[in-house]
């Protein structure tokens, strides 16, 4: 049976930590920022850990992990 492929979109958007958490960037940062509060823009920086159930789904799409 051939090797399973990792979804390209998952490679670009997510990282898996050493403890197995799936990290992703925050959304709502592309346009319309003038209407958003400074606090919202500040808290959307960086990355966040996905909820456990979403992380399981992402791991299914990356059968051999992500670098």
UniProtKB/Swiss-Prot annotation:
Gene Ontology CC annotations of this record: cytosolic large ribosomal subunit
Keyword Ribosomal protein: yes
PROSITE patterns in alphabetical order: RIBOSOMAL_L35
Record has Repressor as a keyword: no
One GO molecular-function entry: structural constituent of ribosome
Entry keywords, A to Z: Ribonucleoprotein, Ribosomal protein
SUPFAM superfamilies per record: L35p-like
One annotated GO biological process: translation
InterPro entries with a match to the protein in the record: Ribosomal_bL35, Ribosomal_bL35-like, Ribosomal_bL35_CS, Ribosomal_bL35_sf
The family this protein is said to belong to: Belongs to the bacterial ribosomal protein bL35 family.
PANTHER family registered for this protein in UniProt: 54S RIBOSOMAL PROTEIN BL35M (PTHR33343), LARGE RIBOSOMAL SUBUNIT PROTEIN BL35M (PTHR33343:SF1)
Designated name of the protein: Large ribosomal subunit protein bL35
């Amino acid at each position: 049976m051939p090797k399973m492929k990792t979804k390209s979109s998952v490679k670009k958007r997510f990282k898996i930590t050493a403890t197995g958490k799936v990290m992703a960037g925050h959304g709502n940062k592309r346009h319309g920022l003038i209407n958003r509060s400074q606090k919202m823009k500040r808290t959307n920086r960086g990355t966040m850990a996905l909820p456990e159930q979403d992380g399981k789904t992402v791991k299914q799409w990356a059968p051999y992990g992500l670098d």
